[in-house]
Regions:
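Histidine- and/or cysteine-centered catalytic micro-motif in compact active-site loops
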Residues: 73-77, 104-105, 122, 130-131
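Alpha-helical, coiled-coil/dimerization segments enriched in small aliphatic residues
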Residues: 81-109
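Acidic/His-rich segments in extracytoplasmic proteins that coordinate ligands and/or metal ions
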Residues: 1-37, 111-149
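Extracytoplasmic substrate-binding proteins
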Residues: 3-77, 101-102, 156-169
Length: 169
């Protein structure tokens, strides 16, 4: 928000805006930048090394055979799917699965319909949103006639993913 930036600068508070990247490794440059700005380069480098080590460990441990097609969706007023260039998509791929939304051409977060979920036909569905909304959405998905033959619905492979409240306001 340009007005907020102007107020902060006017008050003598330095303002730094980092590029937001939603991939699994995309915020590493931001961590290094913040370490530099805060005079904590060693801590930033240590954190980056830990992140890279963990990602490397995961990629070596997860076989690329029998990859599940995973769809990450949320429902607020409407349904949104996390495609390529999304945090959820990066996590799905890092875990050795296929981001089903990205596979059908969805980029970032896009609004989709119940019918689109049926067309995407995922093996697994993730619901990264507050528990109350996720539970209601899960019931809706499990009981929707259009989705009865979708593998994730048929096999009840719908999972709530805890979202820290700071993410949702």
């Amino acid at each position: 928000d340009p007005q907020t930036v102007a107020i902060l600068k006017e008050a003598g508070i330095p303002v730094l805006r980092a590029e937001l990247d939603s991939s699994a490794q995309g915020n590493i440059p931001n961590i290094l930048l913040m370490g530099y700005v805060l005079g904590r380069e060693d801590a930033a480098i240590s954190l980056v090394n830990e992140i890279e080590d963990r990602l490397d460990f995961l990629s070596k441990k997860i076989p690329n055979t029998n990859q599940k097609r995973v769809l990450s969706i949320t429902k607020w007023a409407t349904i949104f799917a996390a495609g390529s260039n999304s945090t959820e998509g990066g996590i799905i791929e890092q875990a050795g699965a296929i981001n089903a939304a990205a596979e059908v051409g969805i980029n970032e977060h896009k609004e989709i319909s119940i019918e689109s979920i049926a067309e995407i036909n995922p093996d697994v569905i993730l619901l990264p949103q507050p528990r109350k909304g996720a539970e209601e959405f899960q019931k809706e998905l499990l009981n929707h006639p259009v989705l009865l033959e979708v593998p994730a619905i048929k096999n009840q492979k719908i999972f709530y993913v805890h979202v820290p409240s700071a993410w949702v306001g």
